[in-house]
């Protein structure tokens, strides 16, 4: 396998329905996160040189919804648009409750946490502090005038929250000594397949990088009855792999054409993918699944990506209600993420940061069906809302 488009999705809704023993939830919020996530993924794909990207748009959206409560008028309008519309209080309340719901999951397989570091020279505005509490944010003071020490403190938190998988997402040069407040979000997931792959059956197999290039990759094999669908409109086939953890699953989206990934992504960015995922149904026969094992690590420059999806004012417009007695503006927005898929399951996580400085110091049974994943494809880990997503040119990723 060489190019991979990875979507890691978490589905947690309120209006549930059942199909063949599976519980699904479809909500307006889930659809909003789905569509916004695919737009961010599309821009990430277009900007990536090597096409190895894993990301968590949900992590970005949670921080934006928190920031919105103290932002300027134009920033609020842009943020509301990608968060699904509505008034600012409604948006913060909705995403705050979502964050609370995630915080109640068993941390053995899902951690969602927000940390706010406030400069010793500043205090959070009262209203913003109340919103931070709604998001169950931890708030600590920190001395940003010592950038290396500040970065070390933040990195220790990231390392702890991701169980050692993301150790140093914040470098010293990302910390402006004039920083007033920095907000960070961690999403970490560790799932085990309901039916594990047999490691003894993993072997080197061909993966089509493109129509002219074939490489060898360690490929796992599973013969199992699975949910499956063929989508002519999308130009892809889809298959579901459930986890032992209740409600979670991974969905593989395999383009019909070897070079079909960009076209599938283009269509997915227009309409989202959750509707297609909810249309999955039992294949009616065993699926002979072959899929590479892999590990991807990547970083996103959100200063570049967010304006392409309609959020640019946070980097320009002063936010009057984040801290007391001053206005701030976002100087840096970034994310570091990873995913690992092997015979036992999948581990994935993302660390997202928004750093704001004072405006005065602004900076930026029948026969089995063969489902052979041997060319660029898409996958979703899901329970109704996109948790992490990405794409990769597996030729240069870690395959083990």
From Swiss-Prot:
Any Pfam family the entry gives: Serpin
CDD domains named among the record's database cross-references: serpin1K-like
Signal peptide as annotated in the record: 1-16
GO function terms (MF aspect): serine-type endopeptidase inhibitor activity
Site location (Reactive bond): 359-360
Subcellular location(s) per record: Secreted
Expression by tissue: Hemolymph.
Domain of life: Eukaryota
SMART domains reported for this sequence: SERPIN
SUPFAM superfamilies the record matches: Serpins
PROSITE patterns xrefs: SERPIN
Keywords: Protease inhibitor, Secreted, Serine protease inhibitor, Signal
InterPro entries: Serpin_CS (IPR023795), Serpin_dom (IPR023796), Serpin_fam (IPR000215), Serpin_sf (IPR036186), Serpin_sf_1 (IPR042178), Serpin_sf_2 (IPR042185)
Gene Ontology, cellular component aspect: extracellular space
Post-translational modification: Does not seem to be glycosylated.
Family: Belongs to the serpin family.
Job description of the protein: Inhibits chymotrypsin activity.
Entry comment, domain topic: The reactive center loop (RCL) extends out from the body of the protein and directs binding to the target protease. The protease cleaves the serpin at the reactive site within the RCL, establishing a covalent linkage between the serpin reactive site and the active site of the protease. The resulting inactive serpin-protease complex is highly stable.
Name the record gives this protein: Antichymotrypsin-1
Organism for this UniProt entry: Bombyx mori
């Amino acid at each position: 396998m060489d190019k991979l488009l990875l979507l890691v999705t978490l589905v947690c809704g309120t209006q549930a329905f059942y199909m063949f023993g599976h519980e699904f939830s479809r909500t307006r919020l889930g659809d909003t996160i789905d569509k916004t996530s695919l737009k961010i993924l599309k821009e990430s794909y277009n900007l990536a040189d090597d096409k190895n990207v894993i990301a968590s748009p949900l992590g970005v959206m949670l921080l934006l919804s928190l920031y919105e409560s103290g932002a300027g008028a134009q920033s609020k309008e842009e943020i509301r648009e990608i968060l699904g519309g509505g008034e600012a209080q409604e948006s913060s309340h909705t995403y705050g409750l979502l964050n609370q719901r995630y915080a109640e999951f068993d941390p053995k397989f899902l951690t969602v946490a927000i940390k706010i570091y406030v400069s010793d020279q500043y205090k959070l505005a009262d209203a913003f502090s109340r919103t931070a509490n709604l998001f169950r944010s931890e708030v600590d003071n920190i001395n940003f005038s010592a950038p290396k020490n500040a970065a070390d403190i933040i990195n220790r938190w990231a390392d702890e929250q991701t169980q050692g998988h993301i150790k140093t997402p914040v470098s010293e040069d990302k910390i402006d000594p004039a920083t007033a407040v920095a907000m960070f979000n961690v999403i970490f997931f560790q799932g085990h397949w309901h039916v594990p792959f047999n490691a003894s059956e993993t072997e080197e197999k061909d993966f089509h990088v493109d129509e002219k290039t074939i490489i060898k990759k360690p490929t796992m094999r599973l013969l199992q009855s699975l949910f499956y669908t063929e989508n002519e409109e999308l130009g892809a086939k889809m298959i579901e792999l459930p986890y032992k953890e209740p409600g979670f699953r991974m969905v593989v989206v395999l383009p019909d054409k070897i070079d079909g990934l960009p076209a599938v992504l283009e269509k997915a960015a227009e309409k989202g993918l959750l509707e297609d995922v909810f249309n999955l149904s039992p294949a009616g026969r065993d699926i002979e699944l072959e899929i590479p094992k892999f590990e991807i690590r990547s970083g996103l420059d959100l200063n570049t990506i967010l304006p392409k999806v309609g959020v640019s004012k946070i980097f320009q417009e002063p936010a009057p209600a984040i801290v007391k007695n001053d206005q701030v503006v976002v100087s840096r927005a970034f994310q570091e993420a990873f995913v690992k898929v092997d015979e036992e399951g999948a581990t994935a996580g993302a660390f997202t940061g928004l750093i704001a400085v004072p405006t005065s110091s602004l900076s930026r049974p029948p026969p089995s069906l063969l489902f052979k994943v041997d060319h660029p494809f898409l996958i979703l880990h899901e329970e109704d809302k996109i948790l992490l997503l990405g794409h990769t040119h597996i030729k240069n990723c870690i395959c083990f």
